[in-house]
């Protein structure tokens, strides 16, 4: 998996903590397209350091990205799904 971009999109404070919405763009060899997904990092404190966010995504959320890529592979394979430029 090649993660192309990790960008903090939004931070919202709730009664339980801080919701960090992160846009992650990635490619994998089995997919025809690159995809951007929105991931949720739920933390006790507000995190704005880009390196920390990149670390959390690449460690905590890596499995979610792999699952998404497998789902997209199935869609591309079964439905001949492609993104038009």
Residue ranges of predicted features:
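Amphipathic, interaction-prone secondary-structure segments
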Residues: 2-35
